[in-house]
């Protein structure tokens, strides 16, 4: 593969414009025409200002007066030495054998619960087990046991909820809220109307006067349940408002303990920005500090030991995968692309936090590679490339042939081959998993994606500000969500026949909503930095254009309301009962949305990856859990 030079060739070049794969209805014959490429010898001066909290804007001026913008992004935080010198003993056989014994012991705990049927707490005990194996990240070992436990709980579910046990005379909020959340997440048809029975005579949720740990925990579970609301569930909105306020006030009153840590984590990360492996790492600390659990409950000890072992064993797998990713990154010539962000380790970490089953190596590596390519293309189309060069590149991608590089500036040749080779390689991996060729399908997705970039590049070049609707429709494609998810998803051991794929990928509501969240949330976090780089077009600026007199604050408030509504719609698309598509088939696309949403929680965590994103890498990838 050609190494990449960021400096375009000064020679003339041509472009061969062929019929794109995605435009099958066009009858135009292929033709070639020569287009003059503005050369760019090595720039005289480059000024780089790096800040961990801000983005600087640089302009490179070539000898022939071509100006190219760069983002002034901070450099790669994870050099070769950091990756190559990672070491962990947890890949040894003894640790895996210990984990297997613990898995059997936990299965026995699940089995023993059937002997306690009819006991005063048989329902809450089952929910406790399911909730904790999921939060600790070890639920993949107990799918059958979880289903059996939830079938049992659901058989006693009523319009007023449930109590602690099957013989409970009255229902209670803690059991009902925890049960509602878990049952809904597993596709059981439970109605939010059940929470109306826990409001006072004037229809308001009321706090408990005693405020015991059990009372507080009930509100924690009510808050967790409220986050998986469907559109139109007014009672869930009220529950969220009440429980969030209650828990924030409670944090000011109670001492620092495992419960306060749990409340803080739940309020901080919720569900839509909480990544399963990251949640597991945080919950291990909470779970292990809960003296009530650890002193009187042998079950808790087994769960915690297994969770820690599994976490550390997976880090030995991550080390091997990171070495593979690093080889790809170097072989692709990526280190020589100096105008872009290098966040391949961060993207791999996100993938590892949502799909940490050992067999999903193809997904983790594919996601990291796809996201790196997307980042390079994003920076090339938004900042570095001229409009004429970008037209050449877009046309070359639609040819899908290495000879298309003959028509490209020198700095684009290696980028083209990185896209070409990686997409082909991921298609080969997908063919093994899905037993059919998906290359043409993937090519169509990449073509549409680059067309959306081309549209934005034209807007930037001409200073055109589109309407909000026009911008959002294009922006959902240019967000990159679809191309980041599609091929990595197809490498998994989850069947995606065509009728399922169309309900998960384009043109499904699930895909549309996921792309919308990424575009809307991304713009609320990036618009100021983008504007400083000369990119005026964003959801904020387009909304203000459509609504004369509206301020940035008005626009942000409107977008946040939109995001809240889209999240509820996304919940419905994932969890709606009686769907023809299993939740397991939709979950990975949904979790990718959570991963991107996490990256934009506080800032643009991909441009500025030296704060929260760096902490995520350290906590889930580099640092083992003390046993």
Curated annotation (Swiss-Prot):
Localization (cell): Plastid, Chloroplast
State where Mg(2+) 3 binds.
Answer: 530
The enzyme's E.C. designation: 4.2.3.120, 4.2.3.119
The transmembrane residues are: none
Pfam families in the record, alphabetically? Answer: Terpene_synth, Terpene_synth_C
Domain of life assignment: Eukaryota
The protein's name in its UniProt record: (-)-beta-pinene synthase 2, chloroplastic
Say which species the protein is native to.
Pinus banksiana (Jack pine)
Q: What is the lineage of its organism?
A: Eukaryota, Viridiplantae, Streptophyta, Embryophyta, Tracheophyta
The encoding gene is: TPS-(-)Bpin2
């Amino acid at each position: 593969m050609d190494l990449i030079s960021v400096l375009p060739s000064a020679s003339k070049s041509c472009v061969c414009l062929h019929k794109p794969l995605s435009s099958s209805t066009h009858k135009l014959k292929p033709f070639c025409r020569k287009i003059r490429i503005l050369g760019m010898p090595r720039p005289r001066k480059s000024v780089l200002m790096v800040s961990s909290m801000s983005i600087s804007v640089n302009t490179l001026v070539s000898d022939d007066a071509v100006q190219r913008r760069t983002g002034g992004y901070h450099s790669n935080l994870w050099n070769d030495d950091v990756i190559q010198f990672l070491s962990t003993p947890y890949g040894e056989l003894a640790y895996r054998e210990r984990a297997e014994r613990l898995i059997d012991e936990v299965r026995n705990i699940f089995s023993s619960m059937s002997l306690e049927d009819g006991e005063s707490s048989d329902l809450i005990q089952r929910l406790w087990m399911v909730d904790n194996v999921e939060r600790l990240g070890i639920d993949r070992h107990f799918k059958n046991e979880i289903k059996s436990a939830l079938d049992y709980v659901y058989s006693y579910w009523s319009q007023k909820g449930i109590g602690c046990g099957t013989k409970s005379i009255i229902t209670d909020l803690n059991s009902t809220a925890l049960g509602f959340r878990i049952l809904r997440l597993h596709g059981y048809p439970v109605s939010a109307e059940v929470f109306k029975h826990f409001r006072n005579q004037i229809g308001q949720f009321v706090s408990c006067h005693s405020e015991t740990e059990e009372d507080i925990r009930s509100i924690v579970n009510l808050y967790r349940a409220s986050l998986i609301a469907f559109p139109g569930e007014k009672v869930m909105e009220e529950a969220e408002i009440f429980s969030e306020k209650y828990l924030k006030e409670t944090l000011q009153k109670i001492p620092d303990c495992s419960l306060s840590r749990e409340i803080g984590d739940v309020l901080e990360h919720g569900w839509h920005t909480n990544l399963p492996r990251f949640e597991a790492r945080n919950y291990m600390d909470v779970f292990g500090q809960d003296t009530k659990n650890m002193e009187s409950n042998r079950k808790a000890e087994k769960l915690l030991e297994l969770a820690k072992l599994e976490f550390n064993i997976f880090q030995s797998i991550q080390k091997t995968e990171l070495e593979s990713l690093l080889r790809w990154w170097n072989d692709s010539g990526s280190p020589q692309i100096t105008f872009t962000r290098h966040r391949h380790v961060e993207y791999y970490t996100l993938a590892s936090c949502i799909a940490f089953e050992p067999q999903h190596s193809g997904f983790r590596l594919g996601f990291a590679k796809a996201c790196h390519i997307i980042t390079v293309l994003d920076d090339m189309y938004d900042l570095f490339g001229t409009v004429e060069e970008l037209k050449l590149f877009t046309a070359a991608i639609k040819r899908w042939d290495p000879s298309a590089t003959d028509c490209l500036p020198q700095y684009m040749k290696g980028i083209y081959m990185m896209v070409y080779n990686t997409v082909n390689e991921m298609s080969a991996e997908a063919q093994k998993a899905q037993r059919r060729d998906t290359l043409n399908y993937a090519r169509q997705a990449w073509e549409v994606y680059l067309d959306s970039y081309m549209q934005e590049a034209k807007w930037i070049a001409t200073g055109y500000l589109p309407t909000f609707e026009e911008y959002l429709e294009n922006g959902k494609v240019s967000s990159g969500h679809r191309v980041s998810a599609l091929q990595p998803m197809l490498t998994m051991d989850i069947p995606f026949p065509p009728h399922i794929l169309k309900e998960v990928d384009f043109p499904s509501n699930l895909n549309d909503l996921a792309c919308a969240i990424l575009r809307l949330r991304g713009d609320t976090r990036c618009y100021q930095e983008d504007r400083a780089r000369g990119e005026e077009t964003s959801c904020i600026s387009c909304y203000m254009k459509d609504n004369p007199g509206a301020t940035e604050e008005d626009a942000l408030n409107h977008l946040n309301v939109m995001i809240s509504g889209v999240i509820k719609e996304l919940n419905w698309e994932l969890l709606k009962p009686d769907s023809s598509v299993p939740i397991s088939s939709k979950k990975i696309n949904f979790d990718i949305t959570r991963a991107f949403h996490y990256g934009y929680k506080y800032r643009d965590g991909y441009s500025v990856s030296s704060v929260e994103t760096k902490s995520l890498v350290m906590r889930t990838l580099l640092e083992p859990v003390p046993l």
